[in-house]
Amino acid sequence: MNSLLWRKIVGASVIAALILPMSVSAAGIGSRPANPDPNNPRTQSIFIYNLSGGATKSDQLHLQNGLDEKATVEVYAVDGTVTATGDMTCKQKVEDKVDAGKWVNIPKQEITLEAKESKLVDFTVKVPGKVDVGEHNACIVVQRKNTQSLATGGVQIQTRQAVRMAIVVPGDIHRDVTID
């Protein structure tokens, strides 16, 4: 019985050793705002815009391949949402965009980066003319494109990295609550 347990542990360790290097290398793609506001340190890691209804803002995402190999990535926008614990999270690509994620247009959504290469990715935010005041959240997601076929077998790990976008629409917020 102990011999069987030992074989399972060794087998699992060998499988983990084969899989882990792939997952570590997948984390070598990164992004951040390309044009942070020098007066607001938070904009080094988050896009923060104050935009009125109907306004348009063009900006760039700094995309970097930290890997020693060429990588093709997808870049796309999704809605951001606040969790029950107050944390910010990004919706999935397959979910319908109903808020700020819908306002972001990224013309080039598939980008190939050579090893250690960086590129700037252009995008535009267009706030609808009629929109509620307050903060609206989106995420610009970067995800390495899966080039392996499922037919090759093994375990495939897909990771994504995102940069938060907070769009504040100015105005007075009126929240009237009536309790009967």
Give names to the regions the model predicted.
Residues 141, 148-180:
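Membrane-proximal low-complexity regions enriched in glycine and acidic/polar residues
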Residues 67-69, 115-117, 159, 171-173:
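Short flexible coil/turn linkers enriched for glycine and charged/polar residues
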Residues 58-64, 71-78, 85-89, 99-153:
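Ligand-binding face of N-terminal immunoglobulin V-set domains in extracellular IgSF glycoproteins
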Residues 2-11:
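Bacterial N-terminal signal peptides that target proteins for export
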Residues 31-67, 71, 110-112, 177-180:
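Beta-sheet-dominated interaction scaffolds and their linkers
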Residues 22-26:
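Sec/Tat signal peptide C-region and signal peptidase I cleavage site
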Residues 12-21:
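Bacterial N-terminal signal peptides
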Residues 35-36, 90-99:
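Short, basic/aromatic beta-hairpin or loop at an interaction surface
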